[in-house]
Amino acid sequence: MTKKHHKEQEEIQETIKTEAAEENVGDETVAIPAATESDIEAEIAARDAEIQKLRDEVMRRAAEFENFRKQKEREAAQSGKRMLENTVRDLLPLLDDLKRLMEHIPAELQEMAEAKPFVEGVELIRKNFKSLLESKGVKEIEALGKVLDVNFHEAITQIDVPDTEPDTIVQEYQTGYTLGDRVIRHAKVIVAK
């Protein structure tokens, strides 16, 4: 071999070694900068903080949704109660009229054979109507003989009544009603002076 040929072969071998070293990194340990333990702990802490932040956000959103759901349920229940109150308030004059009708039927008419079924029918309608309202939670406010309570009674006038305490209800002009714990209509009453 000539020197020239020998030199070319050495250059080729050198090139091959260089290329192999560049391509075959697996044969050598690659120098990656080693992360310090404090860097890893800081990264873990940052990720834990982010996870906790996301958990808190999820919990907050869940609580907001639950509050929203409860609020809508309360609003629906209140709306139903208001609707029932308004309906009952509108029906009370009918009950008053049936009561007045029964109070003003003359005794002779009540005893007449021809009128007795009519009178009994009107009384039955009044009782059934009153029972229906009671089944919905409507109750009459007791008034006669009670001391005036402005939460339930409305005094329309005062009269002198011997041997009666002042502010005692002596006559009921219009019956009052409650629905549950709410007054639908105050009892209109006459009280003693």
UniProtKB/Swiss-Prot annotation:
Molecular-function GO term, any one: adenyl-nucleotide exchange factor activity
Region (Disordered): 1-26
The keyword Iron is annotated on this UniProt entry: no
Protein location: Cytoplasm
Disulfide bond entries: none
Role, per record: Participates actively in the response to hyperosmotic and heat shock by preventing the aggregation of stress-denatured proteins, in association with DnaK and GrpE. It is the nucleotide exchange factor for DnaK and may function as a thermosensor. Unfolded proteins bind initially to DnaJ; upon interaction with the DnaJ-bound protein, DnaK hydrolyzes its bound ATP, resulting in the formation of a stable complex. GrpE releases ADP from DnaK; ATP binding to DnaK triggers the release of the substrate protein, thus completing the reaction cycle.
Name of the protein: Protein GrpE
Organism classification: Bacteria, Pseudomonadati, Chlorobiota, Chlorobiia, Chlorobiales
